[in-house]
Amino acid sequence: MQRRVPLSPDAAHCSSCMLGHVCVPVGMPANEVEKLDELVKERVRVERGKTLYELDDPLDAVYGVRFGSLKTQLEDSSGQLQITGFHLPGEIVGLDGMIESKHVSSAVALEDSEVCVIRLPEIDRVSTQLPSLQQQFRRLMSREITRSHQMLATVGAMRSEQRLAAFLLNLSQRYAALGYSSTEFVLRMSREEIGNYLGLTLETVSRLFSRFGREGLIRINQREVRLIDLPGLKQLIGQESC
């Protein structure tokens, strides 16, 4: 179920949102960020397991995750689903459809979530007053493409244990950017969803979590994970730790 929430005059806007350092305003001068307040006029609340948008829906907006988290996924002709991304607060969902002018994936809430609706006509309108906005969205699209390419490289070139380690380190970095703990967080996605994303079976993911626990790399209790040995995880994927 979706529930649309019109913004009240005292609601948090882009210029006062605590996610501004990772969302649309990231890197923009303060005087320009104030003009972004005109971009978002409503929010949508999406219950866990419900869809924000479907594959091939016309693209009339992109969405900034305000709280909660979502997954994006594709479905092939046989009905098999492939998860293409997990999206945390401050991240923009739907950018991958801007070239085709339609959504190229479906977006589903992993938990009760709320997103800011950024309608494309509003982007065009505000861009006439703020020419740098179009460039900002190109940067955001570039960030999304880079993330997708990194994921393809991870799945294509790494062993199974390296894929899971890279996934956990990626979440660690993203939570740190939000100002949360980089070593303790809750996995909002199931192990089966992690496996689907990484190209691993559920059994392999479960086995690797157990192995990482035995080796002292992590401590996990159901979906609560603590990264105990960050240097060890980085070494596993061939990164030098500082």
Swiss-Prot record:
DNA-binding region in chain numbering: 191-210
Coiled-coil region(s): none
Annotated keywords: DNA-binding, Transcription, Transcription regulation
InterPro entries given in the database record: cNMP-bd_dom, cNMP-bd_dom_sf, Env_Response_Regulators, HTH_CRP, RmlC-like_jellyroll, Tscrpt_reg_HTH_Crp-type_CS, WH-like_DNA-bd_sf, WH_DNA-bd_sf
Origin superkingdom: Bacteria
Domain HTH crp-type, first and last residues per copy: 158-231
An MF annotation (GO) of this entry: DNA binding
GO cellular component: cytosol
Record's function text: May regulate gene expression in response to changes in oxygen levels or to changes in the redox potential of the bacterial environment.
UniProt name for this protein: Transcriptional regulatory protein btr
Taxonomic classification: Bacteria, Pseudomonadati, Pseudomonadota, Betaproteobacteria, Burkholderiales
